A protein has these predicted regions:
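Ser/Thr-centric signal marking residues that sit
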Residues: 40, 61, 77
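Short glycine/proline-centered loop/turn elements that form peptide/ligand docking sites
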Residues: 44-47, 77
Length: 166
């Protein structure tokens, strides 16, 4: 298995975080690995784009998941820790974190577009996430979206911030 930290499907976001790779390079890499018989596990970061680009981040990530056809996809939620440059941007007011509800809305939108042509194991069960999700794309997209919407309506279902630390 090859693990790939793609972070986002948006070239704007990838540039913003100095990823050093483009969306197309990441897609091509996953496709080559899968074609060679190697399973891939690709990780994306919820909340990475902030409030200005969250919709683009969600849609472009969802369509990237659909296009790359990885064996596994997982989501983590952004947590700013030293020495991350984004932490300094946050402290200086140049970057704003999404609220938990905004992170869930972003994930719903991403799942709407994450329709790979072959089954893909999806996990969002990392300690950083407000809600744990597990399913198979595209078969379980609607049930995962429904779970997220329930959590958006009842904040008591969200993981407490104290338990999101790594």
């Amino acid at each position: 298995m090859v693990y790939i930290g793609a972070e986002s499907g948006s070239d704007k976001v990838l540039t913003m975080v100095n990823k050093g790779e483009t969306r197309q390079q990441l897609i091509d890499g996953v496709k080559k690995l899968e074609a060679a018989g190697l399973k891939t596990s690709v990780t994306f970061i919820s909340g990475l784009a902030g409030p200005e680009l969250w919709e683009e981040h969600a849609i472009e990530t969802g369509t990237m998941i659909a296009e790359m056809n990885a064996s596994y996809v997982s989501l983590l939620t952004l947590m700013l820790q030293p020495p991350a440059p984004m932490l300094e941007d946050y402290k200086a007011g140049r970057f704003t974190l999404l609220t938990p509800e905004e992170v869930l809305a972003e994930t719903c939108l991403m799942l709407k577009y994450a329709r790979p042509s072959k089954p893909c194991v999806f996990r969002s069960n990392h300690a950083s996430n407000y809600v744990s999700l597990r399913g198979n794309l595209p078969m379980d997209n609607e049930s995962m979206i429904a779970s997220l919407k329930r959590c958006m309506e009842d904040r008591g279902l969200l993981k407490d911030e104290r338990f999101r630390m790594l």
